[in-house]
């Protein structure tokens, strides 16, 4: 299938809020350390005034915070989800299947990913490095995709529909019962990883083009 529309829409959703793309990678790298990230820390890394950090985060309504106002989740999260993302013996979590395939390249770490088939509950797992996926179990694993909607809450509009499945046939059967989702498609986990790699390439190009 043609994945270009999904890449374009993902990039559009990330860039919809001015500054989100620039904030994303530093934030992910800090969250990958396994502890909450303060706005002051983020402002220092980005060399932004505190007001700019606050303005971008205010529009990124999916962002998760602890009781002290520190960031604990944006795609990668310290709160438990169905997508376990283990790096350097630290157990983190992701919002959706595609996040687990995208983030290793952005944070420069290999992750051991485990989850469950969204249709059957069967366990699924794989190892995701910045450049490849390995140890895919079961081997025929699939991923569901939808086109991101124009909504501030990307988690609700996109991530909640992007799952792992034990096989393509299982995923296609699930998709037949969820035809109301715009742009719903089923791809192999290898195709989904390729989409993630292409997304990362475009995202990093966009960031470098804005670097003075």
Swiss-Prot record:
SUPFAM superfamilies: NosL/MerB-like (SSF160387), Winged helix' DNA-binding domain (SSF46785)
Biological process (GO), any one: response to mercury ion
Entry's EC annotation: 4.99.1.2
Keywords for this protein: Lyase, Mercuric resistance, Mercury, Plasmid
A Pfam family it matches: MerB
Record's keyword annotation contains Lyase: yes
EC class name: lyase
Catalytic activities: an alkylmercury + H(+) = an alkane + Hg(2+)
InterPro entries: MerB, MerB_HTH_dom, MerB_lyase_sf, WH_DNA-bd_sf
GO molecular function, one term: alkylmercury lyase activity
Family of this protein: Belongs to the MerB family.
Role: Cleaves the carbon-mercury bond of organomercurials such as phenylmercuric acetate. One product is Hg(2+), which is subsequently detoxified by the mercuric reductase.
NCBIfam families referenced in this protein's UniProt entry, alphabetically: lyase_MerB, PRK13239.1
UniProt protein name: Alkylmercury lyase
Organism: Escherichia coli
Organism phylogeny: Bacteria, Pseudomonadati, Pseudomonadota, Gammaproteobacteria, Enterobacterales
